[in-house]
């Protein structure tokens, strides 16, 4: 009997935590709708996202953190989603952008190659590659070549 009571107490705590989590998530969404991204990002930083498996929720938080200019937090959330196989090509593209923004070119190149494989006929692979090479201070001639390849492929 005592064990049963402890189980109920634990479940009540879990439900309260879930309830509080949902309240904070709604706060974040309302702040984001009002374009108050910094405040929304601060609330998001205080929350534990490790159990969240919903792509839509994680995408919202990634977008909030990006809009607030916190690329490291946005990158970390995107990695969390990536490791759960959420988001598909769009997430890989976004994660590559975050790695570029935080000057992690090794990971950016690896993800770019993955994106290019998945997106063989997608115009965005040229744009992403251009952004990557430009951030790496590639010579102008190489950047022009990338743009010409883009133009030749998508006239």
Label each PLM-derived region with a short phrase.
Residues 18, 52, 86, 120-121, ...:
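Short coil turns that delineate tetratricopeptide repeat
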């Amino acid at each position: 009997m005592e064990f049963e009571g402890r189980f109920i107490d634990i479940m009540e705590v879990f439900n309260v935590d879930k309830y509080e989590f949902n309240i904070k998530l709604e706060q974040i969404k309302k702040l984001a709708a009002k374009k108050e991204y910094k405040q929304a990002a601060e609330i998001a930083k205080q929350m534990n996202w490790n159990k969240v498996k919903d792509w839509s929720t994680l995408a919202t938080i990634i977008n909030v953190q990006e809009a607030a200019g916190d690329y490291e937090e946005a990158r970390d959330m995107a990695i969390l989603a990536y490791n759960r196989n959420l988001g598909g090509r769009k997430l890989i593209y976004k994660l590559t952008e975050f790695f570029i923004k935080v000057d992690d070119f090794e990971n950016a190149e690896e993800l770019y190659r993955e994106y290019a494989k998945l997106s063989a006929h997608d115009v965005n692979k040229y744009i992403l590659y251009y952004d990557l090479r430009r951030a790496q201070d590639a010579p102008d001639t190489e950047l022009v070549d990338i743009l010409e390849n883009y133009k030749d492929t998508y006239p």
